[in-house]
């Protein structure tokens, strides 16, 4: 899949563990999600590799981007489209050397525009700011001003992703504020019907662009 900035757009699903994760990811893809990030902090490396490989193949079937959270080795092993790095997840330069020029490398920038500039200069392809709203997934996260979504793009020239507490009731706010994509966790993967939740989020996003 050739890397185009326009691919990094819309509703961006970040997984959380659940026993039927493959079925849930298939459901959100049917619902119109175009980006999936696999996030699993467990120590079961074999299960994570098997699960990530299956999800990568599933995303390929739907023409969606598949990224791995934190783990560059896992991203390389399953031929993911890229990796998302947090504060302590290793250097962008090292990830680029391992994954190659065609891989997507995203970075968490919290509320730090200087960090965004620095990591894009090192080779990151997109920057994520948040938590934009209070997050049920990471309640300890500080809040980032919504203005960063637009100023971050202007400062770096790269797509910006909003993350933190985003659901169907507020996704229109981050769309209107200039985010290229909205990362969603609980509103998709804690939903009783992930496909319906995805359709609602995608519709709200599209109405607000």
Swiss-Prot record:
Binding positions for 4-amino-2-methyl-5-(diphosphooxymethyl)pyrimidine per the UniProt entry: 37-41, 69, 108, 138
Needed cofactors: Mg(2+)
Keyword Transferase: yes
Single GO cellular component term: cytoplasm
CDD domains, per the entry: TMP_TenI
Keyword Transferase: yes
Gene3D superfamilies: Aldolase class I
Keywords carried by this UniProt record: Magnesium, Metal-binding, Thiamine biosynthesis, Transferase
Note describing how the cofactor binds: Binds 1 Mg(2+) ion per subunit.
Catalytic activity: 2-[(2R,5Z)-2-carboxy-4-methylthiazol-5(2H)-ylidene]ethyl phosphate + 4-amino-2-methyl-5-(diphosphooxymethyl)pyrimidine + 2 H(+) = thiamine phosphate + CO2 + diphosphate; 2-(2-carboxy-4-methylthiazol-5-yl)ethyl phosphate + 4-amino-2-methyl-5-(diphosphooxymethyl)pyrimidine + 2 H(+) = thiamine phosphate + CO2 + diphosphate; 4-methyl-5-(2-phosphooxyethyl)-thiazole + 4-amino-2-methyl-5-(diphosphooxymethyl)pyrimidine + H(+) = thiamine phosphate + diphosphate
Top enzyme class: transferase
Residues holding Mg(2+): 70, 89
InterPro entries assigned to the protein according to its UniProt record, in alphabetical order: Aldolase_TIM (IPR013785), ThiamineP_synth_sf (IPR036206), ThiamineP_synth_TenI (IPR022998), TMP_synthase (IPR034291)
Pfam families linked to this entry: TMP-TENI
Residues reported to bind 2-[(2R,5Z)-2-carboxy-4-methylthiazol-5(2H)-ylidene]ethyl phosphate: 135-137, 165, 185-186
Superkingdom as given in the UniProt entry: Bacteria
One GO MF term: thiamine-phosphate diphosphorylase activity
Biological process terms in GO annotation: thiamine biosynthetic process; thiamine diphosphate biosynthetic process
Recorded family membership: Belongs to the thiamine-phosphate synthase family.
HAMAP family on file: TMP_synthase
Physiological role: Condenses 4-methyl-5-(beta-hydroxyethyl)thiazole monophosphate (THZ-P) and 2-methyl-4-amino-5-hydroxymethyl pyrimidine pyrophosphate (HMP-PP) to form thiamine monophosphate (TMP).
Record-given protein name: Thiamine-phosphate synthase
């Amino acid at each position: 899949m050739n890397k185009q900035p326009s691919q990094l757009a819309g509703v961006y699903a970040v997984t959380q563990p659940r026993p039927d994760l493959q079925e849930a990811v298939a459901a959100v893809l049917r619902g119109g999600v175009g980006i999936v990030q696999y996030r699993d902090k467990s120590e079961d490396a074999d299960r994570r590799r098997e699960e990530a490989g299956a999800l990568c193949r599933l995303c390929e079937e739907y023409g969606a981007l598949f990224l791995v959270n934190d783990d560059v080795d896992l991203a390389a092993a399953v031929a993911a489209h890229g990796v998302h790095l947090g504060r302590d997840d290793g250097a962008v330069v090292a990830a680029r050397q391992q994954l190659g020029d065609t891989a997507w490398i995203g970075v968490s920038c919290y509320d730090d525009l200087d960090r965004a500039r620095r990591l894009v200069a090192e080779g990151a392809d997109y920057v994520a700011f948040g938590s934009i709203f209070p997050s049920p997934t990471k309640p300890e996260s500080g809040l980032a001003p919504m203005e960063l979504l637009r100023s971050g793009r202007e400062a770096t020239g790269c797509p910006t992703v909003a993350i933190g507490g985003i659901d169907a009731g507020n996704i229109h706010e981050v769309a209107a504020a200039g985010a290229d994509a909205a990362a969603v966790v609980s509103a998709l993967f804690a939903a009783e019907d992930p496909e319906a939740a995805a359709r609602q989020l995608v519709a709200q996003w599209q109405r607000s662009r």
